[in-house]
From Swiss-Prot:
It comes from the Bacteria. The lineage of its organism: Bacteria, Bacillati, Cyanobacteriota, Cyanophyceae, Synechococcales. This is Uncharacterized transporter slr0753. GO terms for molecular function: arsenite transmembrane transporter activity. Pfam families: CitMHS. Its main location: membrane. Belongs to the CitM (TC 2.A.11) transporter family. The chain crosses the membrane at residues 1-21, 26-46, 51-71, 97-117, 137-157, 178-198, 223-243, 244-264, 285-305, 310-330, 340-360, 377-397, 425-445. It comes from Synechocystis sp. (strain ATCC 27184 / PCC 6803 / Kazusa).
Length: 449
């Protein structure tokens, strides 16, 4: 087990960063950045090693950056404000239809864009619209977050956790779509079923004075049409890119889409390159890079290998039992630990466990491993992915999209307390983890059949 000072120090820094993030005393990016730099300054990990660990996750960072630029480039067209207003008008004064509208609009967007990015775009539109029709916008924001986190399971690129795990086990966009996206459907259905009970006040409401709503107009329609072509091509290549004679991974597709969107926005003069790049969420990117360094230190000092040995002792070679245990264990952990660092830590841990129990050779531990893991152990990674994604619905600090929504709510004068979010999040998380465990069990049953 862990017995050396650097390992204990790395573990202490990791736990300290997580506690700082949970306390919300300082910004999560500062907490992670500080933790990474402490490890570099104390020479637990060198700066070069830290950069190497960041570069191992280049695909995740490139995908995030590309999507952020792509989406920000088309903000001046006001397409998202227009969609939000149409959502309220289509509800025709019905709280029930409004809640279903939030689910219907958020779901497809989050299937193809990272959930935190989608929340950044749609959440700022909810408070003014809700205030116009006289309802509390906090429950609507919380519902949007639940949907965003859950819909991330619909595709490989919909959630950072799914992309990180998918990248680690080398699953293609199409394979994910056919094998695992049904779990995203089940997660959304579970929200639809539970919404009338959790949000009963708004569900039963009737709104009046809809004629007083703001009516935003779409700007630059020709640019928006061209942008629609770019986004359509990006989505098509997300699906077919990796199956082409010369494979094109999702990260490369996102970067090309971002470049074309920048070119279109700049040449049409709807915005400047400087403004678009300035508004990229650099804070989130730096947070991820810092977390990759911290997780790298856990790998280097042997903490990850020690935890893998412990997992092998507890679970043994019973993959089915281990998968079900992982759904709930990772789900509960993800409710208090942001799911990105959790997944980044769990991937090498699970790979080491697979090696320890003899299901694969040590070559799978290499950063450049591009083969396939044995089919028997894949349910472990699926279970970890589902637990990390759906567990993020449990508390305010469980996912980055939760924190984004809370910040937007506070800007509009209604802070979301930890306990208020918990009141909604706990039942949603409990239902979804049970559904995920049943789905993983079904996957293993059909695999054996």
């Amino acid at each position: 087990m862990v017995a050396n000072l650097p390992a204990l120090f790395s573990l202490g820094v990791f736990v300290g960063v997580i506690l700082l993030i949970m306390s919300e005393k300082i910004h999560l990016t500062i907490a992670a950045f500080l933790g990474a730099l402490i490890l570099v300054f104390t020479h637990v990990i060198t700066l070069k090693e830290g950069i190497d660990y960041i570069s191992q996750s280049y695909a995740t960072l490139a995908l995030f950056f590309g999507v952020m630029v792509l989406v920000r480039s088309f903000e001046p067209t006001k397409i998202f404000e227009y969609l939000a207003t149409q959502m309220v008008l289509l509800a025709k004064g019905s709280g029930k239809l409004l809640m279903l509208g939030v689910i219907a609009i958020t779901t497809p967007i989050c299937a193809v864009l990272p959930n935190a990015t989608t929340v950044m775009l749609l959440a700022p539109l909810i408070p003014p619209l809700a205030q116009e029709i006289g309802v509390d916008f906090v429950p609507i924001l919380i519902l949007m977050v639940f949907v965003a986190n859950s819909a991330g399971l619909l595709t490989l690129v919909g959630d950072p956790a799914t992309f990180i795990v998918g990248d680690a086990i080398n699953i293609s966009f199409n394979d994910y779509l056919f094998k695992l996206s049904f779990m995203g459907v089940l997660a959304i259905v579970s929200i639809v079923v539970i919404t009338p009970f959790l949000f009963r006040h708004i569900w039963r409401s009737r709104f009046t004075h809809l004629e007083d709503l703001p009516h935003p107009q779409i700007n630059h329609p020709k640019v928006l049409m061209a942008g629609g072509v770019i986004i359509t091509l990006v989505l098509i290549f997300f699906v077919i890119g990796e199956s082409l004679p010369v494979p094109i991974p999702p990260a490369s597709v996102a970067l090309m889409g971002a470049c074309l969107a920048l070119l279109l926005a700049s040449q049409s003069k709807i915005d400047t390159v400087h403004n678009i790049l300035r508004d990229v969420d650099w804070s989130t990117l730096i947070f991820f890079m810092s977390i990759f360094v911290i997780i790298g230190s856990l790998e280097k000092t042997g903490v990850t290998a020690s935890l893998a040995q412990l997992l092998a002792v507890v679970v043994g070679q019973n993959i089915a039992f281990g998968a079900i245990v992982l759904v709930f264990t990772v789900g509960l952990l993800s409710s208090v630990v942001p799911n990105i660092p959790l997944v980044v830590a769990m991937v090498p841990l699970l790979k080491q466990y697979v090696v320890n129990i003899g299901f694969a050779g040590p070559e799978i531990l290499g950063a450049n491993f591009d083969g396939q893991l044995p089919a028997e152990v894949l349910p472990l990674f699926y279970a970890m992915m589902f637990g990390a994604t759906l567990g993020g619905n449990g508390t305010l600090v469980g996912a980055s999209s939760n924190i984004v929504a809370a910040g937007i709510s506070e800007q509009h004068g209604r802070p979301i307390s930890f306990h208020r979010f918990l009141r909604y999040g706990l039942p949603v998380m409990a239902v979804q983890l049970v559904v995920a465990a049943l789905f993983v069990a079904w996957l293993m049953f059909t695999q054996q059949g």
